Each structure stands twice: as structure tokens, then as C-alpha cells.
């Protein structure tokens, strides 16, 4: 058994940069056809498609801030490759400024929840509908229940979703909600052979964290909280995401996969 995704179609959100781009590359290398979205980084998205090959990879411009936008993206993935086997909800925003709860505007809160949570609801809703439709088609053709999962969903949360984050309660709440969704949906969708898991990264070297990590005092403080003494790479997060979508993880559902250098252990 290999880490192979031959004949599988994956939708990876936030795929033009960071963890998402690393996941797109790994999934294509594993044999999957991949559709990913980008918000405004068209040049990076086009470059990634050229790197992976247009026959294997498609980019869709889509700002994921509502369930309606999510429905459009799922439809685009199915239109591109005819089916959908894997959803990786990787997109999200982390407002970098420290904001006390009594100073946080309604707009600030609602924007984070819209992007990090509401759009994920839409992605899951429409992806599951497509996966169930495919399962019925397989059952009708074979006359029995498929012996292997018909769908895989991986949500990308955060250590903040497990232990909170002062002055970023909007972000922590949105990521904590994803963990609760995984716990509920993994049981709900098991009967449909759809596995649902979560990867919870800690600090990762991406453009989202670049400014914070460029500040020496902040960098030293961050490193001191991580037993492995460094931040993760995007590939070190994308690897576990890939694993959870392969046959090696066929008996895993409802799990919160911590990928943070041990930070949660000492947080």
C-alpha cells in the first residue's frame, strides 16, 4: 500500500500559497486531480498550475466568505474533473493586530467567523451532497455497500482552537468550532463511508506569520513555547493532511491531528 491518490479528485482551499500550495503539490504528486481556490494572488495560482500541470490542477478565483461562495467552488471542482472525493478546508484569516474583546468591532468578529467558519459549513454541506451521490452510484452499480470510504474531509484548525488565544478570541472561536464540527460530523457521516478529521498546526513559516516571526523578541518568545525549538514548514503540515486522505488512514475518523512541534503539550 502506498500514499497514492490515483483517480481521486481533491478540492483544497487556500491553495495558492503556504500550507495550501504545499498540499496541492503533494496531492498532485500522489496522483490526485486537484482544484484549489485563490482570492487575489492570481500570479501565484497560475504559477502553481503551470508547475503541477493543467491536466492535473485547476485554479478558481473565489473569495470564501459565505456558504454561497463555497457552493460555487464545490460546483467548479465537480465541473472540472467530474467528481469530488476529498475536501481539504485549509483557508482562513488571522487578523494580526491584538484586539481586546471590549475593543473588537462587530465587523471584525463577523468577518473572521464568515471566512473561517461559515464558508467551511458551506463547503462541507455541498461536498457531502456530492460524495453521497457518488456513493449511491457505486452501490447501484455493484449491488452492495462499498468496502472503502467514499469521501475524505480534512479541516485545518489551529492550536488556538484547542487552548484559545488572548486578544484573538475571534480566531480561536472559529478554529475551535472546526474541531467540534469534526467530532460531530465524523459520527454522522461514518455510515456514508465519509471520514472527517482535523489537522491542527501551531506556528508555521508562511507569509501569514512572516511579520510576527521577523520581530526578534516575538520570534524568541514563540520558539520558547515549542519543544522542538522551531516553527514548522508548510510541507510538514501538508504531509499529515495527505496521509489522512490515503488508505493508510482508512480506520481514522474524528481525530484532531496535532502538528505543532509539541507546543500544545506545554501551552
Predicted segment positions?
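Alpha-helical segment proximal to the catalytic Tyr-Lys
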Residues: 129, 187-191, 250
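Short C-terminal tail/terminal secondary-structure segment
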Residues: 98, 163, 241-242, 253-267
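Conserved glycine-rich cofactor-binding loop
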Residues: 16-17
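Active-site helix of classical SDR
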Residues: 124, 174, 182
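Conserved glycine-rich Rossmann-like NAD(P)H-binding loop of the short-chain dehydrogenase/reductase
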Residues: 30-47
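Substrate-binding pocket helix/loop in short-chain dehydrogenase/reductase
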Residues: 97-101, 105-113, 222
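Residue(s) in the substrate-gating loop at a strand-loop-helix junction
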Residues: 158
Amino acid at each position: 500500500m502506498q500514499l497514492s491518490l490515483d483517480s481521486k479528485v481533491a478540492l483544497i482551499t487556500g491553495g495558492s500559497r503556504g500550507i495550501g500550495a504545499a498540499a496541492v503539490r503533494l496531492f498532485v504528486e500522489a496522483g490526485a486531480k486537484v482544484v484549489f481556490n485563490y482570492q487575489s494572488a492570481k500570479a501565484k495560482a497560475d504559477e502553481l498550475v503551470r508547475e503541477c500541470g493543467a491536466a492535473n490542477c485547476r485554479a478558481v478565483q473565489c473569495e470564501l466568505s459565505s456558504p454561497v461562495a463555497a457552493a460555487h467552488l464545490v460546483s467548479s471542482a465537480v465541473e472540472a474533473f467530474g467528481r469530488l472525493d476529498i475536501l481539504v478546508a485549509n483557508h482562513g484569516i488571522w487578523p494580526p493586530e491584538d484586539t481586546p474583546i471590549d475593543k473588537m468591532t462587530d465587523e471584525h468578529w463577523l468577518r473572521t467567523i464568515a471566512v473561517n467558519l461559515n464558508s467551511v459549513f458551506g463547503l462541507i454541506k455541498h461536498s457531502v451532497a456530492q460524495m453521497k451521490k457518488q456513493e449511491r452510484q457505486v452501490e447501484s452499480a455493484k449491488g452492495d455497500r462499498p468496502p472503502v470510504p467514499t469521501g475524505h474531509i480534512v479541516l485545518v484548525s489551529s492550536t488556538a482552537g484547542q487552548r484559545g488565544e488572548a486578544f484573538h478570541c475571534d480566531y480561536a472561536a472559529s478554529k475551535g468550532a472546526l474541531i467540534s464540527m469534526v467530532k460531530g460530523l465524523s459520527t454522522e457521516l461514518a455510515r456514508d463511508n465519509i471520514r472527517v478529521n482535523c489537522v491542527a498546526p501551531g506556528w508555521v513559516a508562511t507569509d501569514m506569520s512572516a511579520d510576527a516571526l521577523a520581530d526578534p523578541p516575538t520570534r524568541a518568545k514563540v520558539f520558547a513555547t515549542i519543544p522542538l525549538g522551531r516553527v514548522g514548514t508548510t510541507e510538514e503540515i501538508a504531509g499529515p493532511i495527505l496521509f489522512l486522505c490515503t488508505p493508510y488512514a482508512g480506520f481514522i475518523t474524528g481525530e484532531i491531528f496535532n502538528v505543532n512541534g509539541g507546543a500544545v503539550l506545554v501551552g
